[in-house]
């Protein structure tokens, strides 16, 4: 009997130990499951917070930074500026003027270099239309924009009432950009870049680009700052685009590239505001004082037939007679080519003050600048455009226009 009792006690003890072991094993295998769930919870993204931003024409707009999945850009320059900062894969539509595969669209800039189109045209070609676009398009096409289903619109229509009305009609934020009279060197351009960076959660990219432009401008200015006025040649810039039209009389007294590079403008003191035409008589009047002529590439197609018809006006210009005519790349092509405006400034500085810029190679500089703006080296593509005529160069006036 005692032996039987001892056996039963031992068996009971073994069963208790086995049960404890089973519970411990269960606890051990369950623990990793709990930890894995916690990791998934902490890894889940937090919801972005709404903020109110002030756009470049003073409108307060509520946005949710970093949340946007479908972007539409409308108006001259909007898609270009977005391309500098934003993710083009988020675009939900483009204006017809920027989709070069369409037959029925504005084509006045097809031969002219537009670096953002050269960089991302293959993306633009796949997108639906958000409107016609082009210099003559002065009103946003709300129905076409809605058909692209954007959750935000980037605009360059600088009219507060129209932008407010469009935002109300679309039901999504409409953010207005602008560049300002000094173009790429203007605080408004920097502000537009910063605004895009804030909205699309790319603030570092925007700041890097703004810092790059400021550094480039400072470098150009520092190299030319100590040149005496008496040693500066008088320079005339012509062919600047304005609403898609231009010729040898279209110029600017306050051409910002001249200001940055400390270049003497032959029209200084005439009171011309912005880009605009001078009279033919004024062109003849300044002819003897013009040491160097800078011609914008976009104007050649218009200047060539004028010269062939009557070369006498051109021949009154000293720079023309002496072969001191130089070709810059297109400053404007559906608004300002901001990266080209910066490269043009290097070209002008090197042309007018060659000793100070002997180390600057324009092809390398073009690639450096387009890489900073668009992430791609585009010199070859820019210079290959029909209206670029092979790139920056000195023009042989005896043969170039014949």
Place the predicted regions along the sequence by residue.
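C-terminal motif of bacterial Sec signal peptides marking the signal peptidase cleavage site
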Residues: 15-19
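Bacterial Sec-exported substrate-binding components of ABC uptake systems
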Residues: 20-81, 204-237, 356-402
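A short, structured surface patch at a secondary-structure boundary
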Residues: 79-144, 152, 157, 266
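Structured C-terminal subdomain patch of bacterial secreted/periplasmic proteins
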Residues: 133, 184-200, 207, 211, ...
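Alpha-helical, coiled-coil/dimerization segments enriched in small aliphatic residues
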Residues: 247-274
């Amino acid at each position: 009997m005692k032996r039987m009792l001892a056996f039963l006690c031992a068996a009971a003890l073994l069963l208790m130990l086995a049960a404890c072991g089973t519970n411990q094993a269960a606890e051990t295998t369950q623990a990793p499951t709990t930890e894995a769930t916690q990791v998934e919870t902490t890894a889940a993204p937090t919801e972005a917070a709404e903020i109110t931003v002030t756009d470049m024409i003073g409108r307060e707009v509520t946005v949710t930074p970093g949340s946007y999945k479908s972007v539409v850009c409308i108006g001259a320059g909007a898609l270009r500026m977005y391309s500098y900062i934003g993710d083009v894969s988020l675009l939900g539509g483009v204006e017809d003027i920027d989709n070069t595969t369409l037959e029925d669209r504005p084509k006045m800039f097809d031969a002219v270099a537009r670096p953002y189109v050269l960089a991302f045209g293959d993306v633009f070609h796949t997108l639906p239309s958000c409107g016609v676009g082009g210099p003559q398009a002065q009103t946003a096409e709300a129905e076409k924009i809605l058909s692209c289903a954007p959750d935000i619109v980037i605009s360059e229509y600088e009219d507060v009432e129209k932008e407010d009305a469009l935002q109300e009609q679309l039901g999504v934020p409409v953010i207005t950009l602008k560049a300002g009279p000094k173009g790429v060197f203007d605080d408004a351009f920097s502000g537009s870049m910063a605004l895009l960076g804030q909205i699309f959660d790319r603030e570092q990219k925007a700041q890097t680009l703004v810092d790059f432009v400021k550094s480039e401008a400072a470098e150009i200015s520092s190299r030319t700052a100590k040149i005496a006025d008496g040693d500066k040649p008088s320079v005339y810039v012509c062919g600047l685009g304005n609403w898609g039209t231009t010729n040898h009389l279209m110029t600017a007294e306050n051409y910002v590239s001249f200001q940055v590079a400390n270049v003497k403008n032959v029209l200084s003191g005439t009171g011309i505001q912005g880009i605009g035409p001078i009279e033919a008589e004024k062109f003849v009047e300044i002819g003897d004082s013009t040491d160097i002529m800078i011609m914008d590439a976009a104007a050649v197609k218009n200047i060539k037939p004028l010269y062939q018809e009557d070369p006498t006006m051109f021949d009154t210009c000293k720079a023309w007679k002496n072969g001191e005519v130089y070709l810059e790349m297109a400053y404007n092509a559906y608004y300002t080519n901001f990266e080209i405006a910066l490269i043009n400034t290097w070209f002008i500085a090197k042309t007018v003050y060659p000793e100070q810029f002997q180390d600057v190679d324009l092809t390398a500089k073009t690639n450096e600048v387009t890489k900073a703006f668009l992430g791609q080296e585009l010199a070859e593509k820019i210079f290959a455009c029909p209206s670029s005529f092979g790139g920056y160069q000195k023009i042989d006036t005896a043969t170039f226009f014949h």
